[in-house]
Amino acid sequence: MIRAIVFDFNGVLVDDEHVHFELFREVLASLGVPLDEAAYLDRYLGFDDRGAFSAALIDAGRDAPPAFVDELIARKAARYAEVAEAGLKFFPSAAETLAGLAERYPVAICSGALRAEIEYALRRLKVRDRVHSITSAEDTERCKPDPEGYLIALDRLRANLPDLEPHQCLVIEDSLAGLEAARAAGMIAVGVTHTYRHDELERAGAAAVVGGLGAITPGWVAAKF
C-alpha cells in the first residue's frame, strides 16, 4: 500500500530539461568543451549540477577543482534565474496532479536541482503549501543514480509517518538515473514519458509508465499499487 508520494522535479513537473541542457552547454562552450544533446541525455542528465560539470570536465581531460565547479554552478544558476523570470513552462496537469495526490498522501520533492529553483517553481505553480518536504542538490553529496536523495526524502517523510517503509513510497520520475536511484532506495517508481521513451523507462525498472501526469490520480495509485 502506498503511503507517500515523491516527485522528481525537472522533467516531471517543470518542462525545463532542454533549458538545463542549453545552459550546461553554454557554460561548457565558454571553456572550449563541446557537448551535444545525445551525450547529455546519455551521460549527464541524471546528475545534479556539481556532478554534471565535474564529470564533463573530467571526460574532456580537464581538472575539476571544487571551487572552479562552484563558479560554473553559479554561472548556470544565474542564467537559469533569468530564464525562469521570463517564464517557466510546466507540464500539463502538473499543479492538479500534485495537489490531488496531496489530498490523500504526504508529497515530497527529491531533485538534483537547486533549492531556490524548486521553491520558485512551486510558488509559481501555487502548490508550495502542498509539499511536505524538499530534498535538493544542497542536501546530498551523491547525485542520482545513487539513492542518497531518496533516502533523505524518506527520512524527512518519517517526521510525520515514523513507520513509513521505502516500498510504501511511490516515486514519479522521468529519467533513467532517477528510476535507478528510486529502486535502489527500495521505492516503487513510475516513469513519465516526458524525456525518455516508454520502452526505455520499462527497461530501467519502472513499475508503471504513463504518458502524462494527468494519469496519476489518487484512485489510480490505490488501484495500481
Where are these regions (language model features)?
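Residues at secondary-structure transition points
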Residues: 15-18, 40, 44-47, 67, ...
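Residue-level detector of anion-binding/catalytic polar loops
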Residues: 34, 106-107, 188, 207
